[in-house]
Amino acid sequence: MGQHGITISQGQPYLFGMVVKTQESVKFTVSLTDRTGKNVYCRATSVGGGDDWTRLEVELTPQAADSDADLRICWENAGYVCVGAVSLLPKDHFHGMRRDVVEAMKDLGIKVLRWPGGNFAGEFNWMDGLLPADMRAPFQSYLGLETQPHTMGYDFSEMNTDDFIALCREIGAEPFITINPCWNTPDENAAWVEYCNGDVSTPYGKLRANRGHQEPYNVQFWSLGNEFGYGHMEGDNTPAGYCQIALENGKKMLEASPGLSLCSSGPYPNKEWAEFSAKPLAGISQMISQHYYGYDPHYTDLSTVEEEYNRCMASVSRMRELIHQSRQWLEPSIRISMDEWNVWYAWYRPSSVTDGIYAALVLHMLMEEAEKSGIALACHFQAINEGMLCVKPNHVSLTAQGQVFSWMNRWHMGNRLCSASQEAVITVDREGRVSATVVNAAFHRKKPVDFSSFGPCSEAVLFSSDTVLPPSSFTQSNVLDQAAGGTLQMPPHSVLFLRF
């Protein structure tokens, strides 16, 4: 038995694992070969089995690279062999995740990481993660498209709470956990909070400690479900009905860990939900969740590329309008968690410079609106293969959005905001260094920039591209010499980073 189409790297050690049950002890041979099976890149044997489930592990180090390799599992004895979970991971994996992807997430400077969703939060049961990974039952998502085409719509709950917290700590992000108020009871969701934040004197805090994590995780941010009110999420989608569910869950969660920052769900901006959900929940939840996806340019007709691009850029202003609408209807004490935003083409779409310019405008707009519109959190959805990182079987790279995120973080994170608009942001750090980012979102026009009043420029980097069509990313250029005179002409669809 085996599997085709596996990408392997030469000299990379892999850990193979398999759970089996047999009538008697069996000798297994595991190998990585080419598609025909004639060229064997590596092979290992293991003896095991029996009338109870047993996990067998071997290490495999292929002597050649192949993007269409076969994993082959053979056994010598005739008889009954029942195979459960099978896995093949790089030996240097991080809690089942690829190390290169984790390092790329760290380099992006992500400060808040939301999990398990998104729509997936409506199907996730955190208690499944208390089992060993090989024993977690697969389930078929009713939103199966979100895990297609890799698993035929099934999910295997491979990441549990401990893995997620480890990831957050590794990349330096605050965890933001979304509960499932439809299929988990208030007591079960309160137990999740206790597992994360309780000390060893509590039942679930003791369980966490017994699993190797003595100190509480102290998770501050919790979302009371995802996208209730839209109709695609299971559960009560009326404002009053959701309010009751959220209230029951939130109270139990606060009993387990007082002082949590709870975020309520809903189809915001929505006047009815603001009145009959957000307002009565204000005693336990001081944030509402708001999502926005910009216009998705189809780029199927070359004669309409400029029109499609401009509509996408204009949708940033629409996002601002919707934030203002929510602010108008919400109580002043309730803040906004803009915890999903992106420009959305389709699942598994190739990224483009269009996305990068859109992201730069949104980040500028959020910095401008954060204080006056009461935006507490903002989460781009999602990092892997829908946004910042392009992850392939054997490498990971920044998309145009990822390039913008990485440099915006490098340029502005931790600084004091001096001035912000959709087109330009200026910040100053503790040493008095001034950092500026400027966006030229025009499709054809150049943009003159005069920064002579700031004095000599110490750094000047331009992100530019000849095309906005997918797949595309920015070319990064050092333009310090061109900026020496205090002025610069920005090309169309470009981003300029200046430091003084």
Positions of PLM-derived features:
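Carbohydrate-binding surface patches
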Residues: 423-455, 463-466, 493-496
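Aromatic- and acidic-residue-enriched carbohydrate-binding clefts of CAZyme catalytic domains
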Residues: 119-161, 201-232, 296-301
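The substrate-binding groove and active-site-proximal loops of carbohydrate-active enzymes
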Residues: 87-95, 140-157, 175-183, 225-243, ...
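An active-site-proximal structural segment forming one wall of the substrate-binding cleft
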Residues: 90-110, 157, 164, 185-224, ...
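C-terminal beta-strand-rich structural cap/linker in extracellular carbohydrate-active enzymes
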Residues: 477-500
